[in-house]
Amino acid sequence: MTDSAFTRAARVIPGGVNSPVRAFKSVGGEPIFIARAEGAYLYDVNGRRYIDYVGSYGPMINGHAHPEIVAAVCRASRNGMSYGAPNELETELAEKIVARVPSVEMVRMCNSGTEATMSAIRLARAATNRTQILKFAGCYHGHSDALLVSAGSGALTFGSPNSPGVPEDFVRHTLTAPYNDIAALERIFVQHGKNLAAVIVEPIAGNMNCVPPLPEFLPTLRALTKKYGVILIIDEVMTGFRVAYAGAQGLYDIAADLTTFGKVIGGGMPVGAFAGSADLMSMLSPVGSVYQAGTLSGNPVAMIAGITNLRLTEAEGFYDTLAAKTQKLAEGLRQAAKKNGIHVVVNDVCGMLGLFFTDLPQVCNFADVQTADTARFAKFFHAMLAEGVNLAPSAYETIFVSMAHDDAVLDETIAIAEYVFAHLEE
């Protein structure tokens, strides 16, 4: 008998995967192995097709293998994969980011969201000459030691938000607060505000599924950070250029001191960036003394993928169309569940959607998220997968909608969900 792709992988890769959430541990079973992707679809190694709502966890806002992105990457690769020297494409991508986000004057490219948030924290500590940072429970900002505390995403999925191997000396410098809890936030600033270097926040908490901010949460956070001289880092790795033309900062009219980017700015290639005012960013080496570097940072193939992905989002009506697609799917899921007597909460913001099996009327924070029935989600996940719809294999991950999800695909998805809800209790 031939080994499965997963069995083969597990011999040489820990857990058979290169990012833990892919392993299906929280939903059970073996992960599907993908051979190719196009538009709204994935195709596994056995040739089966799936409507995909993972979208590589966010970058594929224009769908998989968009012909313009593929063509641009092919052209760039013929000129060399990486130079270890400056190139004009990294300048062009930085210019696009600066043009779209008012709080950004300068950009430093790196290779992942983790690198971006890690570097932003270092820069904030240097700028303030303070050590402590504040993050929010259930928010995930990559797997660096300082930020792997009360973390969401894969850490939350595996029930180990504080990883072994992270020294207590690191953890004690990281404070946590409940997301969307203004009273708790104000108490923390009264007690610790003068010692905080930075607050880092997901403007939409997309790593404990999808939890948008309450109306006064981000404005209060901005006011408190200004009052106490704390650097506000808005982590837009997930939301940047997905939820609006200027990202979540544009959507919610909020301005960061430092912003982190990833996912959409790479178009499927490994790209991250951190950005901010010229004064702050000029503290970075080689101009200043705050060190940050990367062998493949700004490589031309990744840069052209990001440039092309962003250019496609500049089409007239792009974000209105994406928001309408997201709303259609969200309402379809609500009605499909309601028709079958199943209570769910569905949160949605342009291109992002969260489905929670909970009896609560709304989901606003990590504590609310934890009421969700993960076993029921696992059953729903496998039933949807069996019918040809691929969701992230965790109750704590966002559903991503792309421009490739046309009305026919969305209608098919809603019909499948209605069928699955009807048989979920069997």
Curated annotation (Swiss-Prot):
Q: What's a single GO BP term from this record?
A: protoporphyrinogen IX biosynthetic process
In what pathway does it function? Porphyrin-containing compound metabolism; protoporphyrin-IX biosynthesis; 5-aminolevulinate from L-glutamyl-tRNA(Glu): step 2/2
Compartment list: Cytoplasm
Gene that this sequence comes from:
hemL
Stated name of the protein: Glutamate-1-semialdehyde 2,1-aminomutase
Record field: catalytic activity: (S)-4-amino-5-oxopentanoate = 5-aminolevulinate
PTM-bearing positions, type N6-(pyridoxal phosphate)lysine:
K263
The catalytic activity of this protein is classed by the Enzyme Commission as 5.4.3.8
GO cellular component terms, A-Z: cytoplasm
Q: What class of enzyme is it?
A: isomerase
Q: Where is the signal peptide?
A: none
- Write out the GO MF terms: glutamate-1-semialdehyde 2,1-aminomutase activity; pyridoxal phosphate binding; transaminase activity
Known CDD domains for this protein? OAT_like
Q: Which cofactor does it need?
A: pyridoxal 5'-phosphate
Task: List, alphabetically, the InterPro entries matched.
Answer: 4pyrrol_synth_GluAld_NH2Trfase, Aminotrans_3, Aminotrans_3_PPA_site, PyrdxlP-dep_Trfase, PyrdxlP-dep_Trfase_major, PyrdxlP-dep_Trfase_small
Which domain of life does the UniProt lineage start with?
Bacteria
This protein's record includes keyword Cytoplasm: yes
Family statement: Belongs to the class-III pyridoxal-phosphate-dependent aminotransferase family. HemL subfamily.
Cite the record's note on assembly: Homodimer.
Keywords tagged on the record: Cytoplasm, Isomerase, Porphyrin biosynthesis, Pyridoxal phosphate
